[in-house]
A protein has these predicted regions:
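Vicinal oxygen chelate
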Residues: 2, 5-14, 35, 44-48, 64-132
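A short, local hydrophobic-aromatic micro-motif
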Residues: 4-7, 32, 55, 71, ...
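Core segments of cupin and vicinal oxygen chelate
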Residues: 12-54
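Short glycine/serine/proline-enriched coil/turn segments at secondary-structure junctions
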Residues: 39, 64-66, 104-107
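Conserved segment of winged-helix/HTH DNA-binding domains
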Residues: 53-56, 63
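Conserved beta-strand in the GNAT
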Residues: 55-58, 124
Length: 132
């Protein structure tokens, strides 16, 4: 197979600071190139998912954005992250869809719940090694 992995996803946003805050403060992701972005040297920032994968956070006037055609993406959580994350996000008032429930994915069955980022993109948060 020629495809061996995923490099990045791009999230268009009208509120860059709100999206940076969401991915950094809510999902505890490292934000890359923030100083360069704020200095106008680069056109977007990125949130580190793993050593191999990033989410680019691109400022876009909504009328300039391509028609949205993404339903969701799924982030895999570490084995202990699920213990408190659901309740922490709920307490912060993050828009959620339902409770933690079993779901099938690339690594088989796991437990997941869904949240939305500030631009309305659905994010599944899944753990394969956690059991309630």
């Amino acid at each position: 197979m020629a495809v061996v992995g995923l490099d990045h996803l791009v999230v268009n946003t009208r509120d860059v600071e709100g999206s940076i805050s969401f991915y950094r403060d809510v999902l505890d992701m490292e934000i890359l190139r923030l100083d360069e972005f704020r200095e106008g040297k680069v056109g977007f920032v990125s949130a580190r998912v793993s050593q191999e994968i990033i989410i680019d956070i691109r400022p876009t006037k909504f009328e300039d954005a391509v028609t949205p055609n993404m339903d969701h993406f799924c982030l895999v959580l570490g084995p202990t992250a699920m213990d408190n994350l659901y309740e922490e996000l709920k307490a912060k008032g993050i828009h959620m869809d339902g409770d933690v429930h079993p779901a099938w994915g690339a690594q088989g069955m796991g437990q997941q719940f869904k949240i939305w980022d500030p631009e309305g993109i659905k994010i599944e948060l899944r753990c394969y090694s956690w059991s309630p």
